[in-house]
Amino acid sequence: MAVGKNKRLSKGKKGIKKRTVDPFSRKDEYSVKAPSTFQIRDVGKTLVNRTSGLKNANDSLKGRIFEVSLADLQNDEDHAFRKVKLRVDEIQGKNCLTNFHGLDFTTDKLRSLVRKWQSLIEANVTVKTTDDYLLRLFAIAFTKRRPNQIKKTTYARSSQIRAIRKKMTEIMQREAASCTLSQLTTKLIPEVIGREIEKATQGIYPLQNVHIRKVKLLKAPKFDLGALLNLHGESTTDDKGHKVEREFKEQVLESV
């Protein structure tokens, strides 16, 4: 009989369970803070792997984008169809300080606006704010019946659509180029630009459901920590004590 290994004896026991490590035990929880332009500052929590070796938790968090309903940020259900994108720019302790990154409409809201017997007019413009953020704004509008109109349809002529689109572009350019990103955000929340377009185009053709349906951030300037802290209602300046001047008294030695 040949001397060798007994394969049956060398085999390990079947069914031995591997030790499972809970992946959440290696993670930390951070709070996400919205800018002070919104009423509700606490957006929620986010998880990240703890700092270990060369992998820093702060680096993993920076640049994360969160999509939040504007209804939650403003505590108002009327804004439920709009979504705001917030980008993490800085970490302070266990807080993620975010900045505005974009705005969008929910799909169901956009679908509900499109109806028969009316013209849909869209316009977009690329504009730079005073604090050097390059944005692209998309506007949408629909024609409506004139007072005492009997005709069922409200189709605008091509020349009227061109004139309305020109007005929309001019107003968006003017409103966005004359303010900072945070000031533009305060205009977008109550839909100031949409009402301005509706008022300006009244003489061409009456409009309804005029909205800035999308705001896209194309390019951001060099990161400024001071500007971000001001946006979150915090300050970079530390309160330092004043130097107290005292009269110099020469020490007299009693014994040499």
Swiss-Prot record:
The keyword Nucleotide-binding does not apply. Keywords: Acetylation, Cytoplasm, Ribonucleoprotein, Ribosomal protein. The keyword Transmembrane helix does not apply. GO terms for molecular function: structural constituent of ribosome. PROSITE patterns: RIBOSOMAL_S3AE. One of its GO terms (biological process) is translation. InterPro entries: Ribosomal_eS1, Ribosomal_eS1_CS, Ribosomal_eS1_euk. It comes from the Eukaryota. Residues 1-20 are annotated as: Disordered. Component of the small ribosomal subunit. Mature ribosomes consist of a small (40S) and a large (60S) subunit. The 40S subunit contains about 33 different proteins and 1 molecule of RNA (18S). The 60S subunit contains about 49 different proteins and 3 molecules of RNA (25S, 5.8S and 5S). This is Small ribosomal subunit protein eS1. It comes from Aspergillus oryzae (strain ATCC 42149 / RIB 40). The gene is rps1.
